[in-house]
């Protein structure tokens, strides 16, 4: 593994603000550690081509693709002992060929990356021109570009089901450990470094709006899929091919927004709690008990400040506990008359 520092020399971590297939590169200052012109991030085409070129560049294409398929397989629960629980992603060669025939923009990007010096060279020796006749000549083209593009097109042609993608997302949500195989596929540090890039750049030019509304790391694809990660809880794949102007699944985004409107999973939900949404990390009985118990404790102890806070959070102050004791009941029994007045003034019956 190259590690974050080495990879960061070749590819950035910044949102591009451009189309995913744009040929513009990120210009970095001379004092930065790495090359002066690199892809903005691994999510755009240029970054994906670059990262493909960084994977074991001295191995053969077959070895590199097998390694990548195995790693994807491990993300979704595949194990080397041929466990029936999951399979390695299928390589669709016909799709890869179509990418090659039509991917001229990506081919141009590959050579642009080579021109900047950021795409690693292969260690293949240059062939010598052995034709003495000046009308017969041959020349050698550095294969790093074609090899990186070939691998990139092949990765784009791997086939996975929605269940597979959801399991891969769950592995990322589980700090790099596959939930069904218990295989540590990625280190915790790698996952921590990956999720912020998904958050800032995973939804193309709608990444900022998506994170504001949904608040979760995500990655969309032009095939209509959305990979959604709820750290330490679950991974989700939403598949609906109809795309919006940014190239994201229309229903995938709507589903994600509805998820965070019902459950407390937004990254910044800790700063805004209300009773209209459930905390999926807590058992429902415990969640209801916590919500009710805090109000009852504050009422019985005369803690109006806590009750004011609960009102601002839109908590329900009329719910009773297992004995059907409500905050108003406890405040009256304990002689907390200021609390009784406060509750009545706020519509508690």
Residue ranges of each PLM-predicted region?
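Active-site-proximal alpha-helical segments within enzyme catalytic domains
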Residues: 159-178, 230-241
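Ankyrin repeat domain, specifically the short helix-to-loop turn at the C-terminus of the second helix
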Residues: 308-316, 341-348
């Amino acid at each position: 593994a190259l590690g974050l520092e080495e990879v960061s020399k070749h590819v950035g971590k910044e949102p591009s603000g451009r189309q995913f297939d744009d040929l513009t590169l990120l210009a970095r200052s001379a004092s930065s550690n790495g090359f002066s012109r690199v892809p903005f991030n691994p999510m755009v085409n240029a970054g994906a081509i670059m990262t493909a070129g960084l994977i074991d560049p001295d191995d053969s294409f077959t070895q590199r693709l097998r390694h990548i398929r195995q790693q994807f397989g491990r993300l979704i629960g595949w194990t080397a002992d041929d466990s029936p629980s999951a399979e390695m992603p299928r390589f669709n060669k016909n799709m890869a060929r179509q990418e090659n025939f039509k991917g001229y923009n990506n081919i141009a990007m590959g050579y642009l990356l080579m021109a900047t010096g950021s795409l690693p060279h292969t260690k293949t020796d240059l062939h010598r021109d052995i034709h003495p006749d000046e009308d017969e000549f041959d020349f050698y083209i550095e294969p790093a570009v074609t090899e990186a593009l070939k691998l990139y097109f092949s990765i784009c042609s791997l086939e996975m089901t929605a269940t597979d993608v959801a399991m891969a997302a769950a592995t990322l949500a589980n700090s790099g450990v596959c939930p069904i195989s218990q295989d540590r596929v990625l280190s915790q540090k790698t996952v921590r470094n990956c999720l912020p890039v998904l958050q800032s750049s995973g939804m193309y030019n709608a990444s900022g709006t998506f994170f504001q509304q949904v608040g979760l790391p995500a990655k969309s694809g032009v095939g209509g899929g959305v990979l959604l990660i709820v750290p330490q809880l679950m991974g989700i794949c939403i598949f609906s091919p109809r795309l919006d102007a940014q190239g994201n699944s229309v229903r995938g985004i709507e589903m994600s927004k509805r998820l965070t409107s019902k459950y407390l999973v937004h990254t910044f939900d800790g700063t805004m709690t209300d009773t209209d949404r459930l905390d999926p990390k807590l058992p429902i009985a415990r969640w209801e008990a916590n919500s009710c118990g805090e109000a009852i404790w504050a009422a019985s102890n005369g803690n109006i400040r806590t009750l004011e806070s609960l009102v601002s959070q839109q908590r329900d102050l009329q719910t009773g506990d297992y004995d059907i004791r409500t905050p108003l009941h406890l405040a009256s029994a304990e002689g907390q008359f200021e609390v009784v007045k406060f509750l009545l003034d706020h519509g508690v019956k």
